[in-house]
Amino acid sequence: MSSELSETEKRKLIRERRQKKFSNGGASARLNRITGQAENSQLDTESPLDSKSSRETTPTVTKVDSNTEEMDELLENIATSPSNKVEKSQKKKEQATSPQETIDPELEIFKQLAENQQNDVSTPDLFSMLRSMKDNMAKSAATDTNPPLEPVDQQLLDYNNYLINNLKVWSIIFKWCFFLIPYLFALTRSEPISFLPEQFSNPSNFFMIFLSFEIVATSIYFQKLQNIEKSNKINGFQSNNKIVNLVSLIPEGVLPVPDIKGKVIMALQYWDVFSMFLTDICFVLVMMGLFKLI
C-alpha cells in the first residue's frame, strides 16, 4: 500500500513540475523541439498553454447592442406623429428622384458640344441650332399626325346619301325635261318657231347656249350639294367612298404629295360634276338623232 501511495505521489509531483514548467513558457520550446522547428522560423508555433493566461475574454455584447438599437428605433417610431412620417417619406422620395435623372441625355451631349465650341467664334452656336432643329421636328411630327375621324352614324349617312341622290335625280329631270328636250325639238324643226328668239333658233349658237346652261345648272347643283353636307355635317365622299378609304390607309409622308386624301376628295367632287356634264352631252346626241328621224 505504501509503495502504491509513493507511486501516485511521484506521478503527482511530476505532473505539478510539468505544469509549472509550462506556465513559465516552456511549452513553446518543447513544441519546437518535438516538431523540429527552427528558432528563426516565421511560422506561429506558440503553444496555447503559454498564451492562456494573457488572453482576456471579451463579453459578447453585439447581440445585446443590436437589440437595444432596435428597441430605440421602435420607441422613436411610436413617439413620432403620422405627419412627421409623411414628411420624412416625402423627403426620401425627393432625394431619390434627383434632377440628374430628368435631364435629357441628348441635350447633355449638345451642351458638351456647345461648351467645346465656345472658344471658336467663327462657328455658330451648335447647341441652340440643334435644339431648334429638335423642336421643329417635334412640331412637324405633331402636325403631320391626323386626328382619327369620329365614327359616322349609319342612319345619318344613309339619309345624307338619299338627299344627294334625290338632288341629282331632280336636277337631271329639270335639265332634260324643261330645257334640253324642248330646245332640241325646236332646233331640229325645219320650220322656225315664231315665239323663240333668233339666237335660240340659230343652230350655230347651240354650243354656246348649251355650255352656258350647263355651267349655271352645275353651279346650282354643286351649291345645293354643299348645303346638304353642311347641314348633316357629313362629307359623302370622305365617309362612303371606297377610293378615299383606301387612300386614308396610306400614312402621311410616304408619298411626296402633301394632304393626298384632301386632293383625292376634291378630284372626286370634280369628277362627279364632270360626269353629269358628259351624261348631258350623250343625252343631247341621242335626242338630236331621234328628232331627226321624226
Curated annotation (Swiss-Prot):
Signal peptide: none
Keyword Endoplasmic reticulum: yes
The entry's keywords: Endoplasmic reticulum, ER-Golgi transport, Golgi apparatus, Membrane, Transmembrane, Transmembrane helix, Transport
Ranges annotated as biased composition (Basic residues): 12-21
Lumenal side of membrane: 188-205, 294
Chief localization: endoplasmic reticulum
Cytoplasmic-facing ranges: 1-166, 226-272
Location of region: Disordered: 1-104
Keyword Endoplasmic reticulum carried by entry: yes
Compositionally skewed regions (Basic and acidic residues) per UniProt: 85-95
Domain of life assignment: Eukaryota
Entry-linked InterPro entries: GET2, Get2/sif1
Membrane spanning residue stretches: 167-187, 206-225, 273-293
Cell location: Endoplasmic reticulum membrane; Golgi apparatus membrane
GO cellular component: endoplasmic reticulum membrane; GET complex; Golgi membrane
A molecular-function term among this protein's GO annotations: protein transmembrane transporter activity
Bias (Polar residues): 34-65
Function: Required for the post-translational delivery of tail-anchored (TA) proteins to the endoplasmic reticulum. Together with GET1, acts as a membrane receptor for soluble GET3, which recognizes and selectively binds the transmembrane domain of TA proteins in the cytosol. The GET complex cooperates with the HDEL receptor ERD2 to mediate the ATP-dependent retrieval of resident ER proteins that contain a C-terminal H-D-E-L retention signal from the Golgi to the ER.
HAMAP family per record: Get2
Self-association and partners: Component of the Golgi to ER traffic (GET) complex, which is composed of GET1, GET2 and GET3. Within the complex, GET1 and GET2 form a heterotetramer which is stabilized by phosphatidylinositol binding and which binds to the GET3 homodimer.
Family: Belongs to the GET2 family.
Protein name: Golgi to ER traffic protein 2
UniProt organism field: Vanderwaltozyma polyspora (strain ATCC 22028 / DSM 70294 / BCRC 21397 / CBS 2163 / NBRC 10782 / NRRL Y-8283 / UCD 57-17)
